[in-house]
Amino acid sequence: MSPEKQHREEDEVDSVLLSASKILNSSEGVKESGCSDTEYGCIAESENQIQPQSALKVLQQQLESFQALRMQTLQNVSMVQSEISEILNKSIIEVENPQFSSEKNLVFGTRIEKDLPTENQEENLSMEKSHHFEDSKTLHSVEEKLSGDSVNSLPQSVNVPSQIHSEDTLTLRTSTDNLSSNIIIHPSENSDILKNYNNFYRFLPTAPPNVMSQADTVILDKSKITVPFLKHGFCENLDDICHSIKQMKEELQKSHDGEVALTNELQTLQTDPDVHRNGKYDMSPIHQDKMNFIKEENLDGNLNEDIKSKRISELEALVKKLLPFRETVSKFHVHFCRKCKKLSKSEMHRGKKNEKNNKEIPITGKNITDLKFHSRVPRYTLSFLDQTKHEMKDKERQPFLVKQGSIISENEKTSKVNSVTEQCVAKIQYLQNYLKESVQIQKKVMELESENLNLKSKMKPLIFTTQSLIQKVETYEKQLKNLVEEKSTIQSKLSKTEEYSKECLKEFKKIISKYNVLQGQNKTLEEKNIQLSLEKQQMMEALDQLKSKEHKTQSDMAIVNNENNRMSIEMEAMKTNILLIQDEKEMLEKKTHQLLKEKSSLGNELKESQLEIIQLKEKERLAKTEQETLLQIIETVKDEKLNLETTLQESTAARQIMEREIENIQTYQSTAEENFLQEIKNAKSEASIYKNSLSEIGKECEMLSKMVMETKTDNQILKEELKKHSQENIKFENSISRLTEDKILLENYVRSIENERDTLEFEMRHLQREYLSLSDKICNQHNDPSKTTYISRREKFHFDNYTHEDTSSPQSRPLASDLKGYFKVKDRTLKHH
């Protein structure tokens, strides 16, 4: 398979896992799930989905099994990778330790692991287990920082002594140290940098305190990376994983603090002047064992160097074999971490860099120093370096201990050779065991890859099922929305029905009042029924005497009962017809009310028109007093006004006739209602008589049939009358509309008369002016200016008063439209003349 197809399949598996985790979280009520990495943004939103429990359980079981297998493989791969890196680093350090110690004049104090107390061995085993879960990110950070710090960056002008003395201390096993807290590098004249340290070795200065190094120190901060630590099985969320990692780190720090405390105690014991001088210090049994162990190590320092060189060559061969295996393991590790999405982009990039560096670095004498930079620096050796600082300060305070330190360093030189050979033998066995375990792990990895392919094939139908379930959930949500809309519509309908029910209650109250009236009538009918029952008893006594005729009468009675049932059905039909008639009656009443309202409105309009006519009459009287000179014109106007009055009187007479007709209609309706009620009462009385009289049932049935026919005919007659009334109402409405049109025409005619009056007034003024002008001319001709002026002034005063009175009244002001009408009328009159 090509790498592109593999990536596609991995992406499909990841998408399926994400969708399945969303489904599980929604079914179990989990609101948020996802990874805490901001680069991947795996923040799952809570989705309320309705899904079957069986499918969810199957998905959950398969996911748990798949993820458990994946986490186991990750653990195994990480353990193998960390252990191989440790073995390589330690083997390289051991190869270079003799030369390194000879060049730097360093002496290492060691102890054999088998002679350690049982308590310390148990602590070491627990620490081994915990450190297997640490990742290789510390390597990358140390590589980057150490590669950047070259020899040239460190000051060369500082005078530092080349001899460093060490003391015998308790050390832990090499496989437990993976993290580095602080790396402190001391420069010197003869060496570039102290690059790598082992858990078995610790450096202590023997130089006098006045010759301490004043150079700057390069401190490398601890770089942390966390790998999922499985305490109680598979963690469902990354928050739980982070919490477990924090707990693991706290435990590691506690163990580290305990080890630092032990080393401090050993240093205090070894550097205490009372112990060295007087020997009065009471040591604990643990400390006595430690001191005895140091003495035994000093005795075993005279082994052959040829055996040591052979073992070192064997170690180099093993290292060459392990390097390609380390590359394959790192590839598997990266492959599984991609599937889990628990490696960040920076970690992936650094992992690739680490693989390239491992490929490029051969194990030769030239590159041994470069490999030292890439090796893992153990934590406890670094803590010992920190302790060297404190011991340097203590020795500044206690300068008299320098001689004793030099004596101890000479004793430690003898124990170095024995310790290295035994360490090489133990590490060769350790490497062989790890090779076997790595082969088994490769087989397991291949099996797990085949299982992963099977799981991918099984996950495809699960993808389709999840998609179908999601579609079903969407359809259910749409149905819910539709139901909510239907609910809102039903609520609106309910509000309308409540209003309708209130109206029905009002009508029901009216029906109850009618029902009370009918109950009174029923009481009277019951009294009649009692009387008829007495008569019935008498008839039964007579019937007892006529038992011979009973058989014949029973057959007749059956026929009569059938006819009675028919009659009762017809009576019910009559009742329904009566109700329909009542409804029609109510409609007629409503129409009559409307007609009355229209009548009242017309009466008001007539009153207004009459008031306007009265005002016109008053204006005409004023015009008569003022227009004595124009009597002929005014007489014509009066004649026209008389005609108008006659038309108005005719309209009022027509309205009075309409009112009388409406009153007749109302009286007719009232009489019709009374007749209907009387007929209903008669029908009820007749029905009770028909039911209770058994002797004259046959005759009464015939009479009832005749009455039914008569009522049907009466109903038809009433319907026809109702139709006639409706037609008459339509005619009345038409007549009312005609009257309104006539009224509008009359109003227009009155307005035209007013316009003509205004034109006549205007003509009168014009004639007065012409008369005054003519009189002035005549006066001038007779040469009588005094009279003319007197007359002209008098007439002018009269004319001014007249015009002032005319202009003061707003009705006498002619409009432009009236003037135009006046000139048109004048032109027409001139043409007629």
Swiss-Prot record:
Tissue specificity remark: Expressed specifically in testis. Also expressed in tumors of different origins.
Annotated organism of origin: Homo sapiens
Keyword Nucleus recorded: yes
Modified residues (Phosphoserine): S609
Assigned keywords, A-Z: Coiled coil, Nucleus, Phosphoprotein
Name listed for the protein in its UniProt record: Coiled-coil domain-containing protein 110
Coiled coil (residue ranges): 431-778
S-S bonds: none
PANTHER family according to UniProt: CILIA AND FLAGELLA-ASSOCIATED PROTEIN 58-RELATED, COILED-COIL DOMAIN-CONTAINING PROTEIN 110
Subcellular location(s) of the protein: Nucleus
GO cellular component: cytoskeleton; cytosol; nucleoplasm
Signal peptide feature range: none
UniProt entry tagged with the keyword Nuclease: no
